[in-house]
Amino acid sequence: MIDALFPLARPLLHGLDAETAHDLTIRGLSLLPPRRPPADDASLAVEMFGQSFPNPVGLAAGFDKGARVADALLGLGFGFVEVGGVVPQPQPGNPRPRVFRLPRDRAVINRFGLNSEGLDAVADRLKARAGREGIVGVNIGANKESADRLADYVACTARLAPHVAFITVNVSSPNTPGLRDLQGEAFLDDLLARVVAARDASGSSAAVLLKIAPDIALEGLDAMTATALRRGIQGLVVSNTTIARPSSLVESSVAKETGGLSGRPLFGLSTRLLAETYLRVGDRIPLIGVGGIDSAEAAWAKIRAGARLVQLYSALVYEGPGLVGTIKRGLSQRLRAEGLTSLAPVVGRDAAALARDA
């Protein structure tokens, strides 16, 4: 029913500032009765991290920062949901306004600054869903004023790993000063070693993933993928939002706002980086493709570039939750048209071409 209501609600939501509209959406989802997700085409199933994903279409971090509506989101048909980002201590993030729509570009700019209710609140909610169906992961970061950011990631891992299927180490948000410095090889090596050790000490089997910035140079990507392989990282999420502003943006006045750009204009940049990442790691580290997915064609391109799973968020602002089913149906049709019974043969098959042309 929520799919059918979105076209009616969209003008009302878009008449509000973007953050208020989002807060109302979260509130509305929290009021929905429990709903089993629709059955998925068996050809869309993906085995990854020791988990059976019913379909490859996930919700990216940032939508449900407080882990308040993960089950409602799974009920909309997502194959998995990533909650967060979460930091140890509650923090308000940057001053409002801090999120901006670019409707003609089908894009969003945000500078939230990892606003978070903190580790205790999110851990309690994730613990409370123990035994429920559905794959939920969590994105973790560091407090803006932290004296020891590495310790922040360790604290989040130790507390949250027992309650999730995967933990995504976020060192690529552009909205926390100095956070991307942790992508440097020496810092990253130490960080990942500590996070993996904290996961192991917790007794959890949660996979540890690393989220990459789209603005990284290829030399930096070489170092980052080598570090991820060395430290046994089980997945790479490609990519976060970009600080770049493509010349093609129509909403030029809004484009001047600082923050990370997501949505359709990020598609080419993030898909090229995804393909470049696949060319470096192949099947040794599974990839999750994120950035500009707003159709089955875009999701298919991410898979051809090397993604086993995909995530979206910004497109929901414009297309609503019905987009999830539209993408899944489109992927199923593609597989049937090619006579395939799974997505596995498609993963990375065009990575070399897409690294050049996306």
Swiss-Prot record:
GO cellular component: cytoplasm; plasma membrane
Residues noted as binding FMN in the record, renumbered to the chain: A61, G62, F63, D64, K65, G85, N139, N170, K211, S239, G263, G292, Y313, S314
InterPro entries: Aldolase_TIM (IPR013785), DHO_dehydrogenase (IPR050074), Dihydroorotate_DH_2 (IPR005719), Dihydroorotate_DH_cat (IPR005720), Dihydroorotate_DH_CS (IPR001295)
Entry annotation: catalytic residues: S173
Gene Ontology biological process terms in this record: 'de novo' pyrimidine nucleobase biosynthetic process; 'de novo' UMP biosynthetic process
Keywords: Cell membrane, Flavoprotein, FMN, Membrane, Oxidoreductase, Pyrimidine biosynthesis
Pathway in which the depicted protein is active: Pyrimidine metabolism; UMP biosynthesis via de novo pathway; orotate from (S)-dihydroorotate (quinone route): step 1/1
Protein's cellular compartments: Cell membrane
Cofactors: FMN
Keyword Acyltransferase assigned: no
Lineage: superkingdom: Bacteria
Keyword rRNA processing attached: no
Cofactor details (free text): Binds 1 FMN per subunit.
MF terms in GO: dihydroorotate dehydrogenase (quinone) activity
This enzyme's EC code(s): 1.3.5.2
Mode of membrane association: Peripheral membrane protein
Recorded catalytic activity of this chain's protein: (S)-dihydroorotate + a quinone = orotate + a quinol
Chain residues that bind substrate: K65, N110, R111, F112, G113, L114, N170, N175, N240, T241
Stated family: Belongs to the dihydroorotate dehydrogenase family. Type 2 subfamily.
Oligomeric and partner information: Monomer.
General function of this protein: Catalyzes the conversion of dihydroorotate to orotate with quinone as electron acceptor.
Protein name: Dihydroorotate dehydrogenase (quinone)
Species annotation: Methylorubrum extorquens (strain CM4 / NCIMB 13688) (Methylobacterium extorquens)
